[in-house]
């Protein structure tokens, strides 16, 4: 609260109300979510709307991300596109460094030096089929060299506050790349917020075919024809796109040192979840892929089955009396707008709100200054708080206004002793 409040007396208005979920009403008594048994070394399940962590297991263990690294590579590309510094139609020069032959036994777009390819196609080659060659081509296109691009990746991670992130390449093949599940879930949430179209345009696409005839070098075009040429069609590495309703991203990964990794997101009934699972161990690629999909599905189902998104009505609150100001009162508004809450199923019917706000304050009052709060509780336990702030600025009044209010305050204080 502001240090210039008149006296410690604070008005407390208790407003109890039912918060009905938009998708239905639940009458069953609230029960604790059942235990979740996952083999992954590190796990985080996050609600997208609120950033609330619903489940965690060793969330701060530092682990190699493998191809989850490519999400940072894509993020930097989208930033340049959105800033007008790059276009999806820009041609990309495929150097010897980006030749698919340099990355045997790994995920590839199957680029060859001299291919006629665009930024948009490269992005698909990274997001859909996890091309390590495509990641190098994009890094060189943006920064001139892989080393310069890696420096950009680490600078961006530092600027965003992700202290566990460390990158040494744009594709994730090295075990020296580092993340934690907690920070990567936060990054995935930010990625979707900043680049929401990437889900429909890239991450949820189930297959990608390359090279098309027009991508071939003139020398390769000379020995075939559009009718004869057959591109390589590959499926998205995220098998949950086929098997789990609502999944539309994000990225899979594997390196031997870490195991099988997954960053997955799904939306059902207005609720979007983000799951990060790192370090799933298996004896073979098929086994690891199957375990990764099974654990990802189990994590998402646990979240959707046990939690619900609630958008409660805001309770009533009153303007605050302003003394010695150009106006006699200031209106309140919720900081950040109406809240979204995530509750265990069964608790939404017991949701209540307590409004605590200042009775009066001495000018000046700054717009956005905290003057109260709403405390949400379910089943008698606090679940969230929301600040109430000044909706407008109230500067000090003129000399006679301040003098008159000072006299009135003195009179009030004299008779209230």
Annotate the PLM regions:
Residues 2-5, 154-157, 415:
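Periplasmic/cell-envelope proteins involved in peptidoglycan metabolism and beta-lactam response
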Residues 2-15:
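Bacterial N-terminal signal peptides that target proteins for export
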Residues 3, 118, 341-344:
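Helix N-cap / beta->alpha transition motif
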Residues 15, 103, 218:
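Catalytic-site microenvironment of enzymes
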Residues 19-29:
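C-terminal segment of classical bacterial N-terminal signal peptides
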Residues 30-194:
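Active-site-adjacent loops and short helices of periplasmic peptidoglycan-processing enzymes
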Residues 162-163, 175-179, 183-417:
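Domain-terminus/edge residues, biased toward the C-terminal soluble/receptor-binding domains
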């Amino acid at each position: 609260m502001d240090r210039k409040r008149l006296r410690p007396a604070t008005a407390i208005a208790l407003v109890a109300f039912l918060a009905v979920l938009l998708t239905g009403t639940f009458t069953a008594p609230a029960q604790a979510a059942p235990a979740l048994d996952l083999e992954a070394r590190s796990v985080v399940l996050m609600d997208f709307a609120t950033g609330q962590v619903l489940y965690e297991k060793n969330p701060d263990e530092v682990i190699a991300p493998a191809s989850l690294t490519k999400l940072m590579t894509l993020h930097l590309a989208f930033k340049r596109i959105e800033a007008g510094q790059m276009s999806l139609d820009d041609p990309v020069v495929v150097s010897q460094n980006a030749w698919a032959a340099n990355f045997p036994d790994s995920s590839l777009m199957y680029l060859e030096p001299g291919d006629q390819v665009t930024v948009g196609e490269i992005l698909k080659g990274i997001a859909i089929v996890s091309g390590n060659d495509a990641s190098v081509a994009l890094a060189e296109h943006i920064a001139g060299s892989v080393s310069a691009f890696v420096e950009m990746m680490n600078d961006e991670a530092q600027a965003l506050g992700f202290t566990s992130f460390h990158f040494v390449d744009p594709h994730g093949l090295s075990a020296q790349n580092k993340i934690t599940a907690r920070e990567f879930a936060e990054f995935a949430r930010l990625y979707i917020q900043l680049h929401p179209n990437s889900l429909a345009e890239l991450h949820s696409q189930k297959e990608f075919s390359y090279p098309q005839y027009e991508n071939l070098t003139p020398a390769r075009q000379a020995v075939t024809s559009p009718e004869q040429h057959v591109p390589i069609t590959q499926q998205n590495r995220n098998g949950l796109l086929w098997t789990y309703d609502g999944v539309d991203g994000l990225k899979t990964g594997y390196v031997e040192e870490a195991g099988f990794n997954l960053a997955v997101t799904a939306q059902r009934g207005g609720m979007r979840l983000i799951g990060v699972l790192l370090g799933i161990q298996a004896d073979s690629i098929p086994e690891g892929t199957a375990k990764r999909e099974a654990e990802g599905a189990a994590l998402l189902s646990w979240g959707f089955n046990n939690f619900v998104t609630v958008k409660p009505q805001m309770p009533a609150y009153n303007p605050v009396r302003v003394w010695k100001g150009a106006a006699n009162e200031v209106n309140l508004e919720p900081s950040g707008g109406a809240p979204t809450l995530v509750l265990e199923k069964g608790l939404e019917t017991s949701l209540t709100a307590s409004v605590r706000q200042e009775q009066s304050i001495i000018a000046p009052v700054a717009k956005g200054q905290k003057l109260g709060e709403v405390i949400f509780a379910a089943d008698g336990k606090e679940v969230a708080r929301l600040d109430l702030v000044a909706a407008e600025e109230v500067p000090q009044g003129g000399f006679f206004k301040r003098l008159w209010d000072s006299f009135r305050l003195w009179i009030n204080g004299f008779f209230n002793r």
